[in-house]
Amino acid sequence: MSEKLRVGILGATGMVGQRFISLLENHPWFVVVTVAASPRSAGKTYEDAVGGRWKMDTPMPEAVKKLVVMNVNEVEKVASTVDFVFSAVDMSKDEIKAIEEAYAKTETPVVSNNSAHRWTPDVPMVIPEINPEHFEVIKHQKERLGTKRGFIAVKPNCSIQSYAPALTAWKEFEPYEVVATTYQAISGAGKTFKDWPEMEHNIIPYIGGEEEKSEKEPLRIWGKIEDGVIVPAKEPVITCQCVRVPILNGHTAAAFVKFRKKPTKEQLVKALVEFKGVPQELNLPSAPKQFIQYLEEDNRPQVTEDVNFENGMGVSIGRLREDTVYDWKFIGLSHNTVRGAAGGAVLCAETLKAQGYIQAK
């Protein structure tokens, strides 16, 4: 690929925006040329706008330090500099919906980390290994928006990445009822311990809106396209509790599953480790070679050992055992700001590019 596609990051100064910038450093297909944020950051260099709030483990890439932050509300101006944008803006749901559609209407594809459009019927919400065929609704969305190349695609909530991939791998055994509890890292709230000290040695048994997303979003991902919109699946029915725990990165899930065709442990493990999707077939730059690993040890997966499996793009499953009430239970772990946020969105963009939806303007 000769020319890299020019990328803009909307909401570039926040934690997910920073993760986009660090993940896209030296990307073989994409180059960050534009950073946009709130009017209060506009006009400053990216380095000055972020100041002491850089939250990544790796240093700020030199290539973005001197980029002048643009005002995210100046849609035409920002859009004129890029081939597509990643959206991680921090606004109200209605404002996000409006601004993402405004960018799409400038013929600029939007790959969003935000939840605002996850239930817009003709907007695909995609985990690329699971439901890349949902990108087909984009043509219907373009008709609605009146665009030729502009559209919105979104990635799902970070909480579901620790159990939805396993349930997808087990589809042939017909899971129909799932109970899950997620133990979610503070970076999911855009925080570190430095700016959320009350989370140290603490657990908060509530994360606003998270349980509804964790129960409903997998059903949309497993849904079918009918008449140009995505109709959610009816099963498996999921009930979920979401807990904030004093961990920086990594969402863990404890899940219990009932199957119509109860499998053996060997069948379940085989289905997990053999599960592949379009990103693996196409060998996309951010795709994990192994999407799901199974760990036999009783004390795995652990955040410290396993959260960075496949550079944070893989999912780790362990403790698979028969249950007294349900058929099987397991523990899952995924990296909430890589696979669960910016990394998942970058993989969506790579899939969209490989399938011809995103091209140079």
Q: What function would you assign to each model-found segment?
A:
Residues M1-P205, P236-V237, F309, V315-S316, ...:
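N-terminal Rossmann-like NAD(P) cofactor-binding subdomain of oxidoreductases
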Residues S187-K361:
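Charged docking surfaces used in two-component/phosphorelay signaling
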